[in-house]
UniProtKB/Swiss-Prot annotation:
pH dependence: Optimum pH is 7-9.
Required cofactor(s): pyridoxal 5'-phosphate
Protein name: Cysteine desulfurase 1, chloroplastic
NCBIfam families associated with the record: sufS (TIGR01979)
Length: 463
């Protein structure tokens, strides 16, 4: 992580720096947003927001009902990982308490029960993204492993010197580094799409880059920094016109909106459980059936074989071919519970609510002086994801995030968000990021804005 401007302790009400002592003030009169946000929060508590989706579901998330550093927890880091509802935690505990056993290996009751629930989770994931067959879902350790699976299994087998892989400068490291490794091994060339004036990947340039040399387009669906989304259906058409495949990093879209893989028509799509109310340690790869059948194994070991001889082995059909060894059984079952939970609320409802609260976050944050938000401005035609990456002039984002946590119990992300090339392109080393999920409320946003104003006021007092 980037260097920190100063290491902040747990601050008392009066702080001494050098030979001067300063008293902390929660809100500076120079930042009128404090009183405005506080008034807004009071109105929200008694108005229609009191029955918002965020308020209705918060009871399901035990972790949100606690104090951190003497303040009520305000969790605004769901783009890094989401919190887990009780139903998911209970599903994980029930597996270990009542039918813990290995899958696909035993005929006894516990093994049969575990196998049934494990495969049921696969079917739930397939239905959730509208895959035509559950065998198109490969369970992986996370989305990073899913991308590496495609890179090593499909990429090493299909790319040759001079072939081109198109990405954008806004990709997560997980969608850059594997293709760097594969390009070094195969001689393939990586082509990067830069941003346009709205700070979104330039789709016109992407289309211009696609040529008969293009073998793969690997792009995000929603950016974890810019909050922008890409027109995947159009990109797929352009790529398929020249015989290229498309891999979609859907980690920031599957948890937040309806994702239909048959409608998108992408060849591969990856997502991660822990960003969609599920546990860590499991993600999934969607791959078109014919492609998965054409790909060699990624890892060797138990379960992925058909027959093993001393001089050779034959391999199982997908998805087993790509799931060597004992899988994350309880985690897969809990992911299935997360899918049930999200489906019970309804992804259209979740997306609609997040568009509203995400716009509210953008408007409140942009009203603060000296704040620079990255990515496009929201409009009738541009719906940002419910996150804002930003910087405050003169403040290091890590100092800012530390103060918010220690003094206000507000949890946000600071750093490069696994997107160093993008930050370099934007001309900064790091940014702060506040990211929302459907369990957040406008009250959370207001608390964050008040806390941020106090943070800026505190640091400005030393200038």
């Amino acid at each position: 992580m980037e260097g920190v401007a100063m290491k902040l302790p747990s601050f008392p009400n009066a702080i001494s720096i050098g030979h001067r002592s300063f008293s902390r003030v929660r809100c500076s009169s120079s930042l009128s947003v404090c009183s405005a946000a506080a008034a807004s929060s009071a109105t929200i508590s008694t108005d229609s927001e009191s029955v918002s989706l965020g308020h209705r579901v918060r009871k399901d998330f035990r972790i949100l009902h606690q104090e951190v550093n003497g303040s009520k927890l305000v969790y605004l880091d769901s783009a890094a990982t989401s919190q887990k509802p009780a139903a998911v935690l209970d599903a994980l505990q029930n597996y270990y308490e009542f039918y813990n056993s290995n899958v696909h290996r035993g005929i006894h009751y516990l093994s049969a029960k575990a196998t049934d629930e494990f495969e049921l989770a696969r079917k739930k994931v397939a239905r959730f993204i509208n895959a035509s067959d559950s065998r198109e879902i490969v369970f992986t350790r996370n989305a990073t492993e899913a991308i590496n699976l495609v890179a090593y299994s499909w990429g090493l087998s299909n790319l040759k010197p001079g072939d081109e892989v198109i990405l954008t400068v806004a990709e997560h490291h997980s969608c850059i580094v594997p293709w760097q490794i594969v390009s070094q091994k195969t001689g393939a060339v990586l082509k990067f799409v830069t941003l346009n004036e709205d700070e979104v990947p330039d789709i016109n340039k992407l289309r211009e880059l696609i040529s008969p040399k293009t073998k793969l387009v690997a792009v995000h669906h929603v950016s974890n920094v810019l909050a922008s989304s890409l027109p995947i259906e159009e990109i797929v058409v352009w790529a398929h016109d020249v015989g290229a495949k498309v891999l979609v990093d859907a980690c920031q879209s599957v948890p937040h909106m309806v994702v239909d893989v048959q409608k998108l028509n992408a060849d591969f799509l990856v997502a991660s459980s822990h960003k969609m109310c599920g546990p860590t340690g499991i993600g999934f790869l969607y791959g078109k059936s014919d492609l998965l059948h054409s790909m060699p194994p990624f890892l060797g070991g138990g379960e992925m074989i058909s027959d093993v001889f001393l001089d050779h082995s034959t391999y199982a059909e997908p998805p087993s071919r790509f799931e060597a060894g004992t899988p994350a059984i309880g985690e897969a079952i809990a992911l299935g519970a997360a899918v049930d939970y999200l489906s019970g609320i309804g992804m259209p409802k979740i997306h609609e609510y997040e568009v509203e609260i995400g716009k509210y976050l953008y408007e409140k944050l942009s009203s603060l002086p000296d704040v620079r938000i990255y990515g496009p401005r929201p409009s009738e035609s541009v719906h940002r994801g419910a996150l804002c990456s930003f910087n405050v002039e003169g403040l290091h984002p890590t100092d800012l995030a530390t103060f918010l946590d220690q003094q206000h119990g507000v949890a946000i992300r600071s750093g490069h968000h696994c997107a160093q090339p993008l930050h370099r392109y934007l001309g900064v080393n790091a940014s702060a990021r506040a990211s929302l999920y459907f369990y957040n409320t406008k009250d959370d946003v207001d608390a964050f804005i008040v806390a941020l104003a106090d943070t800026v006021s505190f640091f400005n007092s030393f200038k």
